[in-house]
Regions:
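N-terminal, polar/charged subdomain of small-to-medium soluble alpha/beta proteins
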Residues: 1-122
């Protein structure tokens, strides 16, 4: 199978994230990057939307999930996003990065990157 990529960069959302008491009260900014690893040849050959991974649907599902979520860690949030992408939306494999701007003093952001397949959630 080809290792083609569909990339969504800089999805900016707000959610409850963090384990400090003040972080559990107000939503904070998170920035999400997603890379869907899939074979793009069928859609490239046919130019038919039915032959591509529907990244718009996946993006909407992730938005709904994140905005309704409340996690202590960005690691758990990233894993939840990956589950939505592969289990609910059918992505063969996904890389998810979650960034929390301003989380550490003197830095722009702190983040994690994970890679998952459906087998990781069975």
């Amino acid at each position: 199978m080809a290792e083609d990529r569909i990339e969504i960069r800089g999805l900016r959302l707000r959610c409850i994230i963090g384990f400090n008491p003040e972080e559990r009260i107000h939503q904070q900014d998170v920035v999400i990057d997603m890379t869907f690893l899939t074979d793009l040849r069928p859609g490239g050959l046919t130019d038919d939307p039915a032959d591509i991974f529907n990244y718009k649907t996946a993006n909407k599902a992730v938005i709904r999930f994140v905005e309704a979520s409340a996690f202590n860690t960005i690691e758990a949030l990233a894993a939840g996003i990956a589950r939505v992408c592969v289990v609910e939306c059918g992505a063969p494999r996904v890389q998810v990065s979650v960034w929390k701007p301003g989380a550490l003093r003197y830095t722009d952001t702190v983040g994690v990157t994970i890679e998952r397949t459906a087998a990781d959630f069975q």
